[in-house]
UniProtKB/Swiss-Prot annotation:
The gene is rplB. This is Large ribosomal subunit protein uL2. One of the primary rRNA binding proteins. Required for association of the 30S and 50S subunits to form the 70S ribosome, for tRNA binding and peptide bond formation. It has been suggested to have peptidyltransferase activity; this is somewhat controversial. Makes several contacts with the 16S rRNA in the 70S ribosome. Pfam families: Ribosomal_L2, Ribosomal_L2_C. It comes from Proteus mirabilis (strain HI4320). One of its GO terms (biological process) is cytoplasmic translation.
Length: 274
């Protein structure tokens, strides 16, 4: 994997920084694991915009990724690594001994020809999935379940990981990249290693059009609008002299939005400020 800085042959290429991985498959994805992925344009079923700055972009097919990794006791061989337009991480196509193929998240260091396995008896090796009660304390894992059997929900983006810091009976304590420490049932599964493609954060799109290819529309500042369009709008010069709010007058930039007291007691330590 290499970081390539493009030559300034045009204004749109001048600032582009790409991540090039020669190990990625250059052909088409595995068709039986594809689904149609329709774009919403940020609209709900009434046709109203519920999420701004979404629209357009290149047509994409959804890759069905196995986050549960529940095919226990059957070894699988990594056939190839692939690009996935729906996530920052790369994915791996694995062939199980019984002939079934599945997509999994590609951990760091995984390559074509490697063997992976799931279940209680799986070895502590990159790409293998086990219940967290069977994973040694101090191990780095990803694709972590929060409810047994639900499938991985934590640490699925490129370069992310979770560390197991303690085990106490029915729960294990994990440390997230944010600094938060929380308890999770020890029957929940996790995959050994960290998610690959950690260089994803170093890429530079270089031009507005690259965002449009990804379905991201421009974001207009409230202070650049008229008073009829935004609470920050209008005035002489660039000032709005009030606390930052959304276009609908709700406080933003730092206002707490978490309302999930049901799981508060699982959080041992809050995330730390960066």
């Amino acid at each position: 994997m290499a970081i390539v800085k493009c030559k300034p042959t045009s204004p749109g290429r001048r600032h582009v920084v790409k991540v090039v991985n020669p190990e990625l498959h250059k052909g088409k994805p595995y068709a039986p694991l594809l689904e149609k992925n329709s774009k919403s344009g940020g609209r709900n079923n009434n046709g109203r915009i519920t999420t701004r700055h979404i629209g357009g972009g290149h047509k994409q097919a959804y890759r069905i990724v196995d986050f549960k990794r529940n095919k226990d006791g059957i070894p699988a061989t990594v056939e190839r690594l692939e690009y996935d337009p729906n996530r920052s991480a790369n994915i791996a196509l694995v062939l199980y001994a019984d002939g079934e193929r599945r997509y999994i998240l590609a951990p760091k260091g995984l390559k074509a020809g490697d063997k992976v396995q799931s279940g209680v008896d799986a070895a502590i090796k990159t790409g293998n999935t086990l219940p967290m009660r069977n994973i040694p304390v101090g191990s780095t894992v990803h694709n972590v379940e929060m409810k047994p059997g639900k499938g991985g929900q934590l640490a699925r983006s490129a370069g992310t990981y979770v560390q197991i810091v303690a085990r106490d009976g029915a729960y294990v304590t994990i440390r997230l990249r944010s600094g938060e420490m929380r308890k999770i049932p020890s029957d929940c599964r996790a995959t050994i290693g960290e998610v690959g493609n950690s260089e994803h954060m170093l890429r530079v799109l270089g031009k507005a059009g690259a965002s449009r290819w990804r379905g991201i529309r421009p974001t207009v500042r409230g202070t650049a609008m008229n008073p009829v369009d935004h609470p920050h709008g209008g005035g002489e010069g660039r000032n709005f002299g009030k606390h930052p709010v959304t276009p609908w007058g709700v406080q933003t930039k730092g206002k707490k939005t978490r309302k999930n007291k049901r799981t508060e007691h699982f959080i041992v330590h809050r995330r730390t400020k960066k």
